[in-house]
């Protein structure tokens, strides 16, 4: 785009909204800017007419570098730019399309997605599709929420029998219980029965023989049968017995060889009751010479309540651990074997060492028991698990439960002297606990044990997802949601045992189970006191040696590995007092010395957890408050700095305004002085006497040798247009010079200079407006093509019209090609060709066109536009234009005072369509005749020749597209202009009108003359 600088005192600048004085301004589509305001609104880059920039509707100027690029195609947007308000992204009108249907987005309504812009139709379709998908997912999820139906126990599966050495004590109650259990499975789809084995050892304590005999007589719930170990395994793992590998049987061969003589099983009936606790009775078997080892099925992380001090009633109440959500979803998922041994034997393998302080704590914890049970064969709710537990020996070290109900360690040499080694008992037997494990776990048991014994193998708690167990006969596998402990977990040491063994709790009196509500243990393992001595640490280390999986839900008692001798291998300290073990009964037994079953501790733990949560909230709130205070302080500093910057800018603005006022006053003073000087020089110019045409040399002295170029072309014309010199003066001979060497203007002809009448020297004080520092000296003889007046050049060539004008017109009118050339006199020719033609005309010594040099003829025949450009440039560079300075004001006043532009428009050929216009037309002709009387004869002749030539071009306007109005606009700057070029813009309309009137009516004008 381009803009034109104009002078208009009545308009305002678009950018600064200040009035525009006579300084240079830019005008574009009725919008005007100061010269200093015509810059890019983003980068303040100076713009001009040749710059590539955009103009917004509000008048904002944007240069090409700052214009927006399309986000999609990356091209510069030169028309309408669509900018998204959210992301400030720009799109061209072609790329503003929907990414799905590729249609143009209507009404600027769109939805932005990850793929791109979407029209509203596609967006609504997408929303409906998502809503339909969400509804389908909701329906599917509601259909899947149904309770898991447990499969019925197969009636073909035989009940597990009991083998007794030589005899069997079967009461009538056993048969009734068995029948009730079978019928309950058929009628109520309850979970399978739980078998609790009661094994008898060959030795027992003497002080409990009487109690054993009495309790054996009262036992009414045992169902004894004799069966082999192989039958037990086959009946237990019925569904996967074919896939158990032979290696698993070989591993159990040692245990089968050392198995006790008889095994007693009790068939316990599960009930639909509260699953929070399990009460397991330990009835005595009538054998005074045997040590009763009994196994009970318990929950993970069990805790044992103690009996009262009267020792009348004795029971084991196993509490289920309470997780963080106070909800147990899988009770009795992992039944464990509890061996109750009353015989004091030297510990072997994973010996448990309890300190004296621990023993005292055990004794002091007698008062925190729940109510005792009084029925014999009643087990509180045991569901979803069936367990077959076998008789074991006392090879592993055990915790004994004393008669008063408190746990205690056997007083062995290992307890009193931990540094000494104790010889193993000769009657040691291998103790194993068989459970319903899957074939994969049994198959991999040997490799896992070897990995745990590997000194380089790090032992960690097994996650829930890694467990591979068999949950029982037809019991669905469900995981229990247990919140992970934040503390570090206790590392599992080498040589872990697969089962947990407890000492036998002495039983007294009748075994009945009263109705009671058992509370869940809230403290679990996390409330263990940290104040433990070195013996407690060693005890925990040995307790942690029992191999229990940390998984919840599906794990049950695992095959027990042979015990290892205690040694330095197990002396590594525990890393934490808290652990995620779910099945470590030994660990919980040792930690029961801290009264874990107190209901008060449950409340304290809940209070501590709540207090910890409040402390964390307070801590984070305080950190947030500190951060906000720092932000406020930083913002206050920024505000102070910005206020200081604003104050500095305000002071700078005041200083600049003062400077502007001072410069404005100085400018007004200089303008007034320049106007006075101009008036004086105009008076001097009018007083110059004009001689007759015969004395051309005297007449040439009154006119400057160079015409001023209007300020408009001076600013916006290219550099090549300025580089036009007087080529003829460079080739002139020394004899033709009347005084010294002539300076030739290389860029522009300097402004007209007043020449004194007598000595023909330039008048001092006149400052040329042309930026060119060089000027042409006056040549009165007319030998210079450029620099000589029209009269002097015609006198030099002895013709009425200069040869350059005649040659150019003849070349254009030579054939129809020149006259029919589109854009004739409007399009510019090659700058190089134009300069070459001018140089040849300046060097041409012949004064006749028919004797032109061959080179000049060849140049003239190359391009018609170049020939037309040469003609226009010569007319524009005349020191005194064709319509000379002497008649300039008279012509302008004729148009302006009579309002000819409005009263006599020249828009068509029939402008004389009314008598009033005819009268005005005749008045204008008479006025022009009077004015042309002052005009020199050479000027009149050139004007006639040009008018006739333009008439011919005008008649071919259908092909060359140059009508009279267009030709007048092209030739007006070359035919008429003021003395110093200051009125070019102000008088532009009047100049164009008078040129068009003269060229269109030249016959009427010169006919009357």
UniProtKB/Swiss-Prot annotation:
<dbReference type="InterPro" id="IPR050729">
    <property type="entry name" value="Rho-GAP"/>
</dbReference>
<feature type="region of interest" description="Disordered">
    <location>
        <begin position="358"/>
        <end position="433"/>
    </location>
</feature>
<dbReference type="GO" id="GO:0046872">
    <property type="term" value="F:metal ion binding"/>
</dbReference>
<keyword id="KW-0677">Repeat</keyword>
<dbReference type="GO" id="GO:0030010">
    <property type="term" value="P:establishment of cell polarity"/>
</dbReference>
<dbReference type="GO" id="GO:0032177">
    <property type="term" value="C:cellular bud neck split septin rings"/>
</dbReference>
<feature type="compositionally biased region" description="Basic residues">
    <location>
        <begin position="481"/>
        <end position="491"/>
    </location>
</feature>
<feature type="region of interest" description="Disordered">
    <location>
        <begin position="664"/>
        <end position="709"/>
    </location>
</feature>
<feature type="compositionally biased region" description="Basic and acidic residues">
    <location>
        <begin position="664"/>
        <end position="682"/>
    </location>
</feature>
<dbReference type="GO" id="GO:0005938">
    <property type="term" value="C:cell cortex"/>
</dbReference>
<keyword id="KW-0479">Metal-binding</keyword>
<feature type="compositionally biased region" description="Polar residues">
    <location>
        <begin position="683"/>
        <end position="707"/>
    </location>
</feature>
<keyword id="KW-0343">GTPase activation</keyword>
<comment type="function">
    <text>GTPase-activating protein (GAP) for CDC42 and/or RHO1.</text>
</comment>
<feature type="region of interest" description="Disordered">
    <location>
        <begin position="723"/>
        <end position="780"/>
    </location>
</feature>
<feature type="domain" description="LIM zinc-binding 1">
    <location>
        <begin position="11"/>
        <end position="68"/>
    </location>
</feature>
<feature type="site" description="Arginine finger; crucial for GTP hydrolysis by stabilizing the transition state">
    <location>
        <position position="826"/>
    </location>
</feature>
<dbReference type="Pfam" id="PF00620">
    <property type="entry name" value="RhoGAP"/>
</dbReference>
<dbReference type="GO" id="GO:0051286">
    <property type="term" value="C:cell tip"/>
</dbReference>
<keyword id="KW-0862">Zinc</keyword>
<feature type="region of interest" description="Disordered">
    <location>
        <begin position="143"/>
        <end position="228"/>
    </location>
</feature>
<dbReference type="InterPro" id="IPR008936">
    <property type="entry name" value="Rho_GTPase_activation_prot"/>
</dbReference>
<dbReference type="GO" id="GO:0007264">
    <property type="term" value="P:small GTPase-mediated signal transduction"/>
</dbReference>
<dbReference type="GO" id="GO:0005096">
    <property type="term" value="F:GTPase activator activity"/>
</dbReference>
<feature type="compositionally biased region" description="Polar residues">
    <location>
        <begin position="493"/>
        <end position="510"/>
    </location>
</feature>
<feature type="compositionally biased region" description="Polar residues">
    <location>
        <begin position="522"/>
        <end position="553"/>
    </location>
</feature>
<protein>
    <recommendedName>
        <fullName>Rho-type GTPase-activating protein 2</fullName>
    </recommendedName>
</protein>
<feature type="region of interest" description="Disordered">
    <location>
        <begin position="449"/>
        <end position="608"/>
    </location>
</feature>
<feature type="compositionally biased region" description="Polar residues">
    <location>
        <begin position="363"/>
        <end position="385"/>
    </location>
</feature>
<feature type="compositionally biased region" description="Basic and acidic residues">
    <location>
        <begin position="212"/>
        <end position="222"/>
    </location>
</feature>
<feature type="domain" description="LIM zinc-binding 2">
    <location>
        <begin position="69"/>
        <end position="129"/>
    </location>
</feature>
<feature type="modified residue" description="Phosphoserine">
    <location>
        <position position="763"/>
    </location>
</feature>
<keyword id="KW-0440">LIM domain</keyword>
<feature type="compositionally biased region" description="Basic and acidic residues">
    <location>
        <begin position="143"/>
        <end position="155"/>
    </location>
</feature>
<dbReference type="GO" id="GO:0005886">
    <property type="term" value="C:plasma membrane"/>
</dbReference>
<feature type="compositionally biased region" description="Polar residues">
    <location>
        <begin position="399"/>
        <end position="414"/>
    </location>
</feature>
<dbReference type="InterPro" id="IPR001781">
    <property type="entry name" value="Znf_LIM"/>
</dbReference>
<dbReference type="GO" id="GO:0031106">
    <property type="term" value="P:septin ring organization"/>
</dbReference>
<feature type="compositionally biased region" description="Polar residues">
    <location>
        <begin position="162"/>
        <end position="196"/>
    </location>
</feature>
<keyword id="KW-0597">Phosphoprotein</keyword>
<dbReference type="GO" id="GO:0032153">
    <property type="term" value="C:cell division site"/>
</dbReference>
<feature type="compositionally biased region" description="Polar residues">
    <location>
        <begin position="728"/>
        <end position="749"/>
    </location>
</feature>
